Amino acid sequence: MKKFGGVDYMGIDGLFSEDELAVRDAVREFVDEKVIPVIGKHYEEGTFPRQLIPEMAELGLLGSTIQGYECAGVNNVAYGLLNQELERGDCGVRSFVSVQSSLVMWPIYTYGSDEQKDHWLPRLARGEAVGCFGLTEPDHGSDPGSMVTRAERVEGGFRLNGAKMWITNGGIADVAVVWAKLDGEVHGFLVERGTPGFEAPEMKHKLSMRASVTSELTFNDCVIPEENLLPGAKGLGKALRCLNQARYGICWGVIGSAMACYDEALNYSLERVQFEKPIASYQLVQGKLAAMVNEITKAQLLNLQMGRLKDKGELKHQQVSLAKYNNVHQALEIARSARTVLGANGISLEYQTMRHACNLESVYTYEGTHDVHSLVIGATVTGIEAFR
């Protein structure tokens, strides 16, 4: 396979700092050397490449924006770029880092006690512990406020009952950030692996996100100690802030998938000869490639502006919704178009495109469905909430 050289039609690399490019290039090399050679096998077998966790930790990819606690402390643009490169390898790898960083380490750092931070954050940063995030339930997805998982006070702690569904990293997690209603209000809790009454069976037979661990979390009279309550995690809004952190990384990640598909289609079209000339010489194929690089370029600029706003503390969740709404849709369209350039070869695991396309079908839904984000944008521009 030809080495990936990036997609930069408008000279956008010149808008990044040296430090930001250094992070991107280090992760790009890691993906080329360690992820891409093994990911097809893991995708086919439905397994997550756990052997990559120590190397990702060594690169500082886990909780990378957090200051202290053995974390890298990079800015949000660099974090976006590392998500982009990871998903160029596979969405399952990017999802692992995204969940560990934005949905586990970030809420512990933001809402946790000093003791919780000291105990968990260094271990999570080193990859010695893995975390997951439990919000979605079997019957409560886009409306998490209607969750039925409950916590009640007992002597020395809390008793949890309920279930969570579609939980990334659940089956391999050492700790779960779980959201449950206590006295009618949503609170965040830490539930550790091995706690009696807590199980995390893996969900099998997926046709998407196959190189990612997806699990159900069940709580049957699961008693946790008082100190496992996240003291600052009171109210549904605190859970939604976590999702917005993860959603930011998704917006960058899917463009990594789009770049991989475009790059593969471009190289294939230059080598594939039909009617005595490369198919890249035909107007129909050139039109598809032009549309791909056009949408990638627009998404790159959107992501960069979003990252700069986030680094200044000015990014609004509605703006992240627009980026996810645009970028995931365009990445999926690029993957589908790239598959047509590859023809029948496009459905083979020998090529990347169909794997990315299948993964993007999940990303289109998780962390806020495409339709729900359209309602968020609609409410922002009209001032009228259609979903209330």
Predicted segments with their positions:
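Alpha-helical interface subdomain recognition
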Residues: 1-91, 96-99, 111-116, 123-128, ...
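Flexible, small-/acidic-enriched active-site or ligand-binding loops
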Residues: 146, 194-225
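A short, Trp-centered hydrophobic/proline-enriched beta-strand micro-motif
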Residues: 127-135
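Short Gly/Pro-enriched turn/cap motifs at secondary-structure boundaries
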Residues: 124, 139-142, 166-169, 181, ...
